[in-house]
């Protein structure tokens, strides 16, 4: 009996350890997923609400908060959870597996529709560009005409310069006036000779 008594106490602690792991609570990742599924919030569940749910439904130790933080980070990195708000372990989280297939199908449909719609738009854009191009060309020609007009105005400005040259010509008749007296003097000389 002494042998049985010594072997029995040795077996009991092992069972106690095994029972703590199995019966107290499941894995933190499973508890977090269960908490998010229970809330069913479209915006996602916050870390605090997940902690409250786990503490109220499972027997968790004192270090549960730190374990929940670590497991949330792991689930985000593995792709089980999606972080909708915040950074790191803070913010809101949703299950990625349940949302991804629906969203991916919706995104694929929208992408196909966008591609279909985009192709006619692309075809219509060159037409619009072609229609705009001829309209721009006639607009450009009046601008050229305006430039020609502007070029003509300096020519008009040059004409006054020629007008300024006319007074120089007017000075020539002044020179001609002294010539006339010379003619008179030559006539006087001719008279004297007679």
Curated annotation (Swiss-Prot):
Give the matching Pfam families. Linker_histone
**Compositional bias (Basic residues) at which positions?**
105-194
Q: Which PROSITE patterns match?
A: H15 (PS51504)
Record GO cellular component, one term: nucleus
**Superkingdom assignment:** Eukaryota
- Explain the induction of this protein: Both the unedited and the RNA edited versions are induced by butyrate (at protein level). Only RNA edited version is induced by DTT, vinblastine or TNF (at protein level).
Point out residues bearing the modification ADP-ribosylserine.
104
- PTM-bearing positions, type Deamidated asparagine: 4
Question: By its UniProt entry, which InterPro entries does this protein fall under?
Answer: H1/H5, Histone_H1/H5_H15, WH-like_DNA-bd_sf, WH_DNA-bd_sf
Asked if the Swiss-Prot or TrEMBL record annotates the protein with the keyword Nucleus, the reply is: yes
Main subcellular location of this protein, as a coarse class: nucleus
Where are the N-acetylmethionine residues found in this chain? 1
- N-acetylthreonine PTM positions read 2
Its subcellular locations are: Nucleus; Chromosome
Report the record's Gene Ontology biological process terms. chromosome condensation; heterochromatin formation; negative regulation of DNA recombination; nucleosome assembly; positive regulation of transcription regulatory region DNA binding
On this chain, the residues bearing Citrulline are: 42
Modification(s) after translation: ADP-ribosylated on Ser-104 in response to DNA damage.
Q: Give residue spans, biased composition: Low complexity.
A: 1-11
Gene Ontology molecular function: any one: nucleosomal DNA binding
Presence of keyword Phosphoprotein: yes
Q: Where is this region: Disordered?
A: 1-29, 84-194
Keyword set, alphabetical order = Acetylation, ADP-ribosylation, Chromosome, Citrullination, DNA-binding, Nucleus, Phosphoprotein
Function noted in UniProt: Histones H1 are necessary for the condensation of nucleosome chains into higher-order structures. The histones H1.0 are found in cells that are in terminal stages of differentiation or that have low rates of cell division.
Q: Which family does it belong to?
A: Belongs to the histone H1/H5 family.
* Protein name in UniProt: Histone H1.0
Native source species: Homo sapiens
Upper lineage is: Eukaryota, Metazoa, Chordata, Craniata, Vertebrata
């Amino acid at each position: 009996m002494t042998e049985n008594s010594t072997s029995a106490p040795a077996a009991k602690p092992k069972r106690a350890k095994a029972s703590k792991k199995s019966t107290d609570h499941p894995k933190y990742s499973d508890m977090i997923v269960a908490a998010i599924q229970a809330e069913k919030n479209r915006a996602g569940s916050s870390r605090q609400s997940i902690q409250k749910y786990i503490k109220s439904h499972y027997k968790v130790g004192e270090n549960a908060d730190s374990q929940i933080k670590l497991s949330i980070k792991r689930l985000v990195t593995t792709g089980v959870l999606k972080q909708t708000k915040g950074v790191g372990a803070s913010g809101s989280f949703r299950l990625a597996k349940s949302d991804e297939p629906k969203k991916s199908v919706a995104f694929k449909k929208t992408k196909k529709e966008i591609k279909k719609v985009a192709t006619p738009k692309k075809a219509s854009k060159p037409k619009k560009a072609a229609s705009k191009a001829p309209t721009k060309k006639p607009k450009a020609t009046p601008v050229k005409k305006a430039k020609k007009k502007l070029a003509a105005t300096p020519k008009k400005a040059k004409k006054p310069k020629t007008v300024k040259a006319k007074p120089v010509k007017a000075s020539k008749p002044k020179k001609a006036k002294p010539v006339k007296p010379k003619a008179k003097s030559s006539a006087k000389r001719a008279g004297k000779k007679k």
